[in-house]
Amino acid sequence: MLKPLGDRVVLKFEAEKEQTVGGFVLAASHKEATKVGTVVAVSETGIRTITGDIVPPSVAVGDKVLVEYGSGLEVKDGDQELVICREADILAVLA
């Protein structure tokens, strides 16, 4: 398993769906703008501010998140396709 450093997180993206849970069909431009993923690993350290304080990660393993399409670096870990991105690339945590 990958262990991210600094402010990075490891995500596994879900297969893209044609419809949302509410039954709405998403426009092709919207599907390419964002992606939904699950956090599979989070840095243990977080980020250091200018004053030297450490800010812990605001996401946890298992959170479903929305990220901008194309964010991060695609990597393979065994047979899994994962993405390593910065926490700042995460747009929202889905409830």
Curated annotation (Swiss-Prot):
Subunit organization: Heptamer of 7 subunits arranged in a ring. Interacts with the chaperonin GroEL.
Family statement drawn from the similarity comment of this UniProt entry: Belongs to the GroES chaperonin family.
Alphabetized GO MF terms: ATP binding; metal ion binding; protein folding chaperone; protein-folding chaperone binding; unfolded protein binding
Name the UniProt record assigns to this protein: Co-chaperonin GroES
Function: Together with the chaperonin GroEL, plays an essential role in assisting protein folding. The GroEL-GroES system forms a nano-cage that allows encapsulation of the non-native substrate proteins and provides a physical environment optimized to promote and accelerate protein folding. GroES binds to the apical surface of the GroEL ring, thereby capping the opening of the GroEL channel.
Gene Ontology annotations of biological process type: chaperone cofactor-dependent protein refolding
Keyword Cell membrane: no
Record keywords: Chaperone, Cytoplasm, Stress response
Superkingdom of origin: Bacteria
Predominant location: cytoplasm
Organism of derivation: Streptococcus equi subsp. zooepidemicus (strain MGCS10565)
